[in-house]
Amino acid sequence: LGFTFHHHPMLTYWQDHFYVLCNACPVHEERGLTEILLMKSGNGKDWSSPEIVFPHVMCKGEPTFCNHRMGFYISPSGKLLASTAYFPQSEMPPQSGSEDTGKKYFGVAIREINKDGSFGKIYFIAQNNSLYAENEFPFPYYTESDDPGLIAACESLRKDKLITLHWWEQIRPENFDFPESLTDQIVDGNRKFAKAISYYHRNDGAVVALWKNSKSALSYDEGQSWTDVVNLKTFSGGYAKVWGQKTEDGMYAASWRPLGEGSWGRYPQLWATSKDGIIFDGAMHVNGEVIRRYDGGSKNIGPCNYQRGLYEGGPDIPGKDVWVVYSMSKEDIWISRIPVPLVSSSEKYVMEDFESIKGIGDLKAWNVYHPQCATVEMEQTDEIQNMCMKLSD
């Protein structure tokens, strides 16, 4: 599209492919025409060209914008739904204060992604009926679909107390049943509340929620209720996202940006590991590049913009790696594959024979930085018929 702003990336794995969606704006965050883009990949490295899955639409003569806290849902029957939230241009707060509680969203929209790559119709799965009349919504409600399978998938999503917590700042509490420990935070002028949830299950059954603004809480009943929201002083992410998950080796991993309050930078991307999901240590650095290519408003520099991995409960992926997608300075969308177990150093001198590997992904003890315009590949030389590493720029 030629846009220079890309943000809010989301990741899932379905039908043997990775899927990523993100929002795109011409120059500034949520200014001008906005679209939601979708890409897919069979290996996580080579990606399709972006397609517009949620378009910019006009509603009653007024442009609409869209962004999201969640991007995908895979139903029990195997349907893949993409998701975003729409709001009218007139409800976009001034650039100096764009917190989501200041926007009067139409609601949360979904769209089915079919196995052949085509898209279904766009429907609202949750809408703010207290803010808008029925004829003011740009899309129909999901119950108007003629596909019983889609309706069942939407109702399954609506009943999921953990996933729908992504919506709580976009759907007014009177329209949806959210825990008071969250909704009580919505007060005038408060930007530092819990939003953009990431969660994982501990071995004792507790659900650990990690939110933007270094907030956390526990649930012992699958999101029906929560403990009081507290500040995590050691996860000093400032006004940025935190990602946490359980890894295939039975450990836990969390990613955050270490720069605290008052810093505009979102770098480096740190990860720490934990045996119990409570105490994290061994901080390691995955991506510390600070790339800025274009001008634009609300563009924090660095790779810690909306890092998101694969949520619990999805299909099994090939291998045991951790995958994380993120926005570099809210411009380019990156994805990292982190081998499990997560380690910060090699215990011995690295001796890997290029002749014994098929591709760059087979290197176990290397950190490979592989942008599209400066690729790193393994190839066979013509002269000596052996494998070498080729760096292109």
Kindly label every feature range from the protein language model.
Residues M58-P138:
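Asp-box/WD-like beta-propeller blade repeats and closely related beta-sheet repeat scaffolds
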Residues H17-L21, G78-A82, D204-V208, G250-A254, ...:
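Entry beta-strands of beta-propeller and related beta-repeat scaffolds
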Residues H7-M10, C66-F72, A196-S198, A240-W243, ...:
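Beta-propeller and closely related beta-sheet repeat lectin domains
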Residues S236-N287:
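Loop/turn-rich, solvent-exposed surfaces of beta-rich toroidal or solenoidal domains
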Residues M58-E62, K233-K241, G277-G314:
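Conserved blade-ending motifs and adjacent loop-strand segments that build the rim/top face
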Residues E35-G44, S96-D116, S216-A217, P268-G277, ...:
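Beta-propeller blade signature
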Residues H6-H8, W14, V27-S77:
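Blade-loop segments of beta-propeller domains
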Residues K358-S392:
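Extracellular glycan-recognition surfaces and repeat-rich motifs
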